[in-house]
């Protein structure tokens, strides 16, 4: 269930110009075992990537700034996943779970996508993480948090407020990107008018805003900005349509 592109298909059918239809945004907080976005997105995002860390099973080490933009993180995840489904492991500790929102972990734990462990060694064994470098990486990360200085990926650590990965029990989950937002769509102008693919002029009476329109955000949209996009161009479209109706 979800978006079916019905409006986009109809608009293209009457001659709307397409723009960047092959550009998709991937959400880097998803789990490969859950259907769709599943129930673990908030846990992976806010507990593991905002506060905790993400590691490559094969190396046991971090490989990205967990605070980077969605595209940067998704690209880094895809590179690690590769062709052999080497899903990275996102993890955090008990102090983090209680500091953010304990409800974020409740349902994923019940469903079994988030796993809980008494020790980091148990976590490494379960997810088949390269144990020795992993344990060293956690200690190094904790040192970075204390110093508020990530020497590897320059992540801003002041937002951790001292929270690291040291208080048992520990939580881990596989993570992967999944399609989240269609960056492309129909071409519009600043008046939210849809542009014709044939005449390159506005199609009379046809307005668009939000995800159905393309060319607004480029290749990667900032989180939550889709709402502002839809509201802004929706208001513009309403004003333009009302003005057009008065002239009719």
Annotate each predicted stretch with a short phrase:
Residues 1-248:
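Residues forming the flavin
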